[in-house]
Amino acid sequence: PIVLISFETGGVRLHEANAGLLAHAECMDMLQTLRGRVPVVAMIGSKIGCFGGMGFVAAATDIIVMSESGRLGLTGPEVIEQEMGRSEFDASDRALVFRTTGGKHKYIVGDCNYLIADSLTAFHQQAALIADLPWPQIEAMRRIGSEAKVRAQMALTKKISESEPSDARDVWAMAGNTAPQSLVDMDLETFLSNVKRLPVEEA
């Protein structure tokens, strides 16, 4: 058995924030209960993406599968622009939005385990492959669930923060990609063959 969750959400409405936070916590608690019993896979490939508190829920699953057009984050682009100003983040700049929240970026920084083609067939095939994985391999792909993982994530966050990146491409360069701009327009197969990812587990 395997649990597949297709995330397509911008988060809860602000006037339902408290109830939404409680629901998120309950979902994450249930995901921890399922840990080691049934693989739970987040699938993100819609036009809306996965934002708000549901970003936390997605992060609590065992594995995240994204297409290049999928987006994942906590605060959505429009809210960032509203709160910080367009000079800080222009939500109408699609290239910027996808460099920051899109599948390629999330794959490089380790938030996404598998980056696949933008088709239902690709998602079905990836789910079938995941269903056959041994538990130790699935457990190793989790983003949360142990003090060691927390320490690794915090170390990576500190490293990135100290570098003061002004764009996602600066983070890609930190991962060892010597020509980060070239990754933007690469087709999926070429991208996966050439990209270097941040070594979260070694951070």
Residues covered by each model-derived region:
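Amphipathic alpha-helical segments at domain termini/boundaries
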Residues: 82-203
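Conserved catalytic cores of soluble enzyme domains
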Residues: 11-139
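A structural preference for short, pocket-lining loop segments at secondary-structure junctions
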Residues: 1-13
